[in-house]
């Protein structure tokens, strides 16, 4: 029975958040409590940036991860988990509604996909969090060497 539950969990984990919760309930799977979605943000969803309102009720913690952040020429960055740059961001702890809103904003799954990464919290500690990764980097995407979207936008990085 335990194997069957694990198989079902794997089959529904890639559904959008609200559909996943509904499927978990209908299948009788253990449901994670609301507000347990950790998401690493590195661009316009950061505190004070243009799209922060999409997750205004999420708890925010300063954090970093390794990878590569790109300027793609359209007012928002892209992230690739491959790379060794210290990428500055925040880990948001979001409820189902905020998580679904972020999925819509990011064009999940058409424009961006979600991947789990390891994030390091300011002040210590490490968490696993989702990150939005662009499915295909546009031609001309340029790595942001400083790894910090805000500094890059201000011309400091």
At which residue positions do the language-model features occur?
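Glycine-aromatic micro-motifs
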Residues: 2-157
């Amino acid at each position: 029975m335990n194997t069957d539950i694990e198989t079902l969990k794997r089959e529904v984990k890639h559904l959008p958040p609200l559909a996943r919760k509904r499927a978990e309930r209908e299948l009788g799977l253990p449901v994670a409590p609301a507000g347990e979605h950790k998401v690493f943000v590195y661009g316009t969803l950061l505190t004070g940036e243009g799209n922060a309102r999409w997750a205004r009720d999420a708890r925010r913690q300063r954090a970093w991860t390794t990878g590569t952040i790109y300027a793609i020429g359209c007012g928002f960055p892209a992230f690739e988990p491959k790379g060794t740059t210290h990428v500055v961001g925040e880990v948001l702890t979001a409820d189902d509604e905020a998580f679904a809103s972020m999925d819509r904003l990011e064009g999940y799954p058409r424009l961006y996909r979600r991947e789990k990464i390891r994030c390091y919290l300011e002040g210590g500690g490490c968490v696993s969090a989702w990150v939005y990764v662009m499915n295909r980097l546009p031609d001309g995407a340029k790595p942001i060497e400083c790894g910090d979207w805000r500094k890059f936008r201000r011309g400091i990085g």
